[in-house]
Amino acid sequence: MGLIAYFDCPTGISGDMCLGALVSAGVPLEYLMEKLAPLGLTDEYRLTAGLVQKQGQAATKVEVKLLNDHHSHGPGHHGMRHLPEIEQLIKQANLPARVSRWSLAIFHQLAIAEGEVHGIEPEAVHFHEVGATDAIVDIVGTCLGLDYLGIDQCYWSALPTGSGTVRAAHGDLPVPVPAVLKLWQTRQVPVYDNGLTGELVTPTGAAIAVTLASQFGPKPPLNLHKVGLGAGSKDFPLANILRLWIGTEITPHNHPLSSEAPFGQLETITVLETQLDDIQPQAVGYLLESLLHQGAIDVFTQAIAMKKSRPGILLTVLCAPENQNHCLNLLFRETTSLGVRVRQQQRYALEREWQTVVIPHGPIRIKVAYGYQAGKKIILNAHPEFADCAALAKATGQPWQLIHQQAIGAWSNLNKELSPES
């Protein structure tokens, strides 16, 4: 079973904090140096790691020490590489396949954000935030560390905004800097003010999180194997440490109370809600079909009484987090709603599959749902597909109810573990 990683970022995130947490979690510094060497940058930096104290807590501080002050050189120097040059370095470095894929994706996201801020194409971005040697080492090194530990999925906490200003290549910028805001916007990252002043999330850290995160928010259920602690450079009243939680996801297969575990798999869904009192009734059916076509898991309406005693409907949309924006935009485009409530909820969903049975009148698909009890897979229910039964009833002139009963009987004969009545 693959591992999942949760990046707990109470004081923010930067590339060197990611590296520190990964080294703390067991990634050898020598491994990173060996795998980074084919990038051809070893004459530009030195990679070091050591324990430091942050508010009385020990954490690993990884530093990318630049040699000969590479940041001080002009645009023609390697510290100001363009995106295509960085992509070429990564592609030629013989990195593990997913390390290369992750690294390229992170740099592409970062270049898009920086390009939008400056009004240029991503390929034309050449300022130090993307091209600096330390950014390359931070990003590729983080991907190498995740691959070394066998991480399959990454999750991130909500991120703190910070405040104040920071000195950048183009002068003083407000915190969060524009590129970080652009990156957050692409994933609608949950952010909050933790009261700390300064830059807490760097463009490199934001790009890593936005690109690799399966989800932002609370910790997923996991069996915790180890914790890595990565120290930041600044000192705050709160320990400036990124905490990397590594473990296996809790499923019905490995639940610590397997005999009492829920049958279903825990997953996160997005719930969209809006009240409507002026939509044409004919448009409601079209809207529901459009939302399902757009990727909604389910859509339903409830009759409600609104202000001024007007009758209306409460429209609820369930969708996967990655389909949230598609469904949200469709709601605004196809209704008169001026606001939609959004929340994340967890649900237990049964594993399911399609089986086909053949009755005297033709084939019928059966949706079969499974659960796990004490580590054993069991069938919980099975239902003939309504559309198949309806189509066969129309084609043969037989009652729909007869077709449905015959399908259940045929499936039950093939699967003695569950009787039709149970």
Swiss-Prot record:
GO terms for molecular function: lyase activity; nickel cation binding. Keywords: Nickel. Coiled coil: none annotated. The keyword DNA damage does not apply. It comes from the Bacteria. Belongs to the LarC family. This is Putative nickel insertion protein. It comes from Synechocystis sp. (strain ATCC 27184 / PCC 6803 / Kazusa). The lineage of its organism: Bacteria, Bacillati, Cyanobacteriota, Cyanophyceae, Synechococcales.
